[in-house]
A protein has these predicted regions:
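A conserved ligand/cofactor-binding region detector
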Residues: 1-291
Length: 291
């Protein structure tokens, strides 16, 4: 199983796992960040929801050996297997014995593919951005998602005609959010514990870098340091990799939409809508002083 964060909100439904990482409310306006684990093959469906800010583990970044071993030990299957028919919905499920036989063959195929990928890696010395693609049908993906608007997602993905695996993901997300109590703050900082201190400027480095990794931990598996997180923050900033900056947000209110957030403005939005770096730095310092 892919490494993931767990806490009191962690909910498992089928092959989907949902955990609330940060949950913030101010003047009745709520913003929530979840860490998700789900089958890689439904990721394209999840990506169609444009009100979400997302970061995800990448097949181009994870070592071949690690991906192959995950498939060997715990290959992804299907939560529901239906008989073929016209249309997008399989109304009738296979009998349990046939379903078990199919899933056993499916997972065996994945394990055989993982062994083949390991062989190719040694034989040809091919990069992970190529070989990991062969493992995606049996792989999980870890995704960080932040949003203020969830109703349309739940309406579509909890509907009876949604693919069962994304139904289970939506159910896990809904249950995790229902089990979470938001903290009251003007700052939303995923992967930063604000229960014991007020937001600080260095929290921004931690939050952006950990959102980029989709983890509290660095690549070595230990909790990241301020030096590591600041270095990654600056590299992302200098190279224009702005997506991790979308998960950090401040309450701006006025019943306005700030990009895809209602009443909350993301750090990315701040950077992209201010004219020079000095103004951005001064503005961000003010945000943390006023929080």
């Amino acid at each position: 199983m892919i490494n993931h964060t767990t806490n009191d909100t962690t909910t498992i439904q089928g092959q989907a796992i949902a955990t609330v990482i940060a949950d913030t409310v101010y003047k009745g306006s709520r913003i929530t960040t979840l860490e998700l684990v789900y089958p890689r093959y439904i990721h394209s469906e999840f990506m169609t929801h444009r009100m979400f800010s997302r970061n995800a583990s990448s097949s181009r970044a994870i070592p071949i050996e690690k991906t192959a071993n995950e498939v060997l030990t715990d290959p992804v299957g299907f939560d529901y297997v239906g008989f073929n028919q016209s249309g997008m919905v399989a109304a009738e499920e296979l009998p349990e014995d046939l379903k078990e036989d199919f899933l056993a063959e499916w997972k065996l195929w994945g394990m055989q593919t993982a062994l083949k990928v390991k062989l190719w890696a040694k034989k040809y010395n091919i990069h992970k951005q190529t070989l990991n693609r062969a493992l995606e049908p049996w792989s999980r993906i870890k995704v960080l998602v932040t949003a203020t608007e969830w109703d349309n997602f739940f309406k579509l993905r909890l509907a009876p005609d949604a693919q069962p695996e994304i139904q289970n993901l939506a159910q896990a997300m809904e249950s995790a959010m229902e089990g979470s109590t938001p903290i009251e703050s003007k700052m939303h900082l995923p992967y930063v514990d604000l229960t014991d201190h007020e937001p600080e400027y260095t929290d921004m480095y931690h939050s952006v870098a950990r959102c980029a990794r989709v983890s509290y931990n660095n690549n070595g598996g230990t909790t990241s340091t301020i030096e590591e997180d600041k270095k990654l923050f600056e590299r992302l900033q200098n190279n224009g990799h702005w997506s991790p900056f979308e998960h950090i947000a401040e309450y701006w209110g006025c019943d306005e939409m700030y990009a895809n957030f209602h009443n909350w403005c993301s750090l990315r939005n701040v950077y992209e809508n201010m004219s020079n770096e000095d103004k951005v730095v001064d503005f961000i310092h003010k945000i943390f002083r006023d929080s």
